[in-house]
């Protein structure tokens, strides 16, 4: 029954396939089965990604916040029953205390999405079962290096201009860029708690519905997908990711205080 409900929530073409301020995978490929066992789908009014960092904890983007969530683990295809598939509800969510959903700029006086501190922890209702298709991934212990080869993944749109959910988990290989490259596009909205990643020639990018998913650079989880330009994958418009090394103390504190 819940797969039928999920099918309704994620109906092809629905605008709510991604939340406001979302990041959106284009130019990628179908991930090898069970190659991203820490990847989860976070289902509320929208579709987001997430990362299993502990059997009881998922990290995702703060702008994926909702009053109710379902977390799908061990899935390659969102719409098919699979042997490693698990489902968990969320006991409690913890947005980063310094996250501000919208800001007003002096130039336009229009609210825009602020990607600073765009992280949220989800405490699962019961621990995930660790299997061949469901595994945790460690938090980073070292700064990522500019120029690193990175992999982003998600079930977000594969079309730069349309919000159409991908049935199969998609992967895309991109590079970690200097923050200056994102500053050229997003101006003062880029800070040292963010990572900039993509391809300057365009054609490869995260897209609608990928928010909250992992950015893995040289085999290490370094970022969480936050946001980017619309349409996705345009030249000279890399995407922004939350820089996890800046938040490990907060993550560990929340997990310790909420056993």
Curated annotation (Swiss-Prot):
Q: Which residues are glycosylated?
A: 106, 189
Q: Where is the signal peptide?
A: 1-18
| The entry's keywords | Disulfide bond, Glycoprotein, Hydrolase, Metal-binding, Protease, Serine protease, Signal, Zinc, Zymogen
GO terms, biological process: regulation of systemic arterial blood pressure; zymogen activation
Name its co-factor(s). Zn(2+)
Keyword Disulfide bond carried by entry: yes
The molecular function terms in GO held by this entry are:
metal ion binding; serine-type endopeptidase activity; serine-type peptidase activity
Catalysed conversion reaction: Preferential cleavage of Arg-|-Xaa bonds in small molecule substrates. Highly selective action to release kallidin (lysyl-bradykinin) from kininogen involves hydrolysis of Met-|-Xaa or Leu-|-Xaa
Q: List the disulfide bonds.
A: 31-171, 48-64, 150-217, 182-196, 207-232
Catalytic residues of the enzyme: 63, 118, 211
Q: What class of enzyme is it?
A: hydrolase
State the GO CC annotations. Answer: extracellular space; secretory granule
How would you summarize the oligomeric state and partners of this protein?
Monomer.
Its family?
Belongs to the peptidase S1 family. Kallikrein subfamily.
Specify the protein name: Tonin
């Amino acid at each position: 029954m819940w797969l039928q409900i999920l099918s309704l929530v994620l109906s092809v073409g629905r605008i709510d396939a991604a939340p406001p301020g979302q990041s959106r995978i284009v130019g990628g490929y179908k991930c090898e089965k069970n190659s991203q066992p820490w990847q989860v789908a976070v289902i509320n009014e929208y579709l987001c990604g997430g990362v299993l960092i502990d059997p009881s904890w998922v990290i995702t983007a703060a702008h994926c916040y909702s009053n109710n969530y379902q977390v799908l683990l061990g899935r390659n295809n969102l719409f098919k029953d699979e042997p490693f598939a698990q489902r968990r509800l969320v006991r409690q969510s913890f947005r980063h205390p310094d996250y501000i959903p919208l800001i007003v700029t002096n130039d336009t006086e229009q609210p825009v999405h602020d990607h600073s501190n765009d992280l949220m922890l989800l405490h699962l209702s019961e621990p995930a079962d660790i299997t061949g298709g469901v595994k945790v991934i460690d938090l980073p212990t070292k700064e990522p290096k500019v120029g690193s080869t990175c992999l982003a993944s998600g079930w977000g749109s594969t079309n730069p201009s349309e919000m159409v959910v991908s049935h199969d988990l998609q992967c895309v290989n991109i590079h970690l860029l200097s923050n200056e490259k994102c500053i050229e596009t997003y101006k003062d909205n880029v800070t040292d708690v963010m990572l900039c990643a993509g391809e300057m020639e365009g054609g490869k990018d995260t897209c609608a519905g990928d928010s909250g998913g992992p950015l893995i650079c040289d085999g290490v989880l370094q970022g969480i997908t936050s946001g980017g330009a619309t349409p996705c994958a345009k030249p000279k418009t890399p995407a922004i990711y939350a820089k996890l090394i800046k938040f490990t103390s907060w993550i560990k504190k929340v997990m310790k205080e909420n056993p």
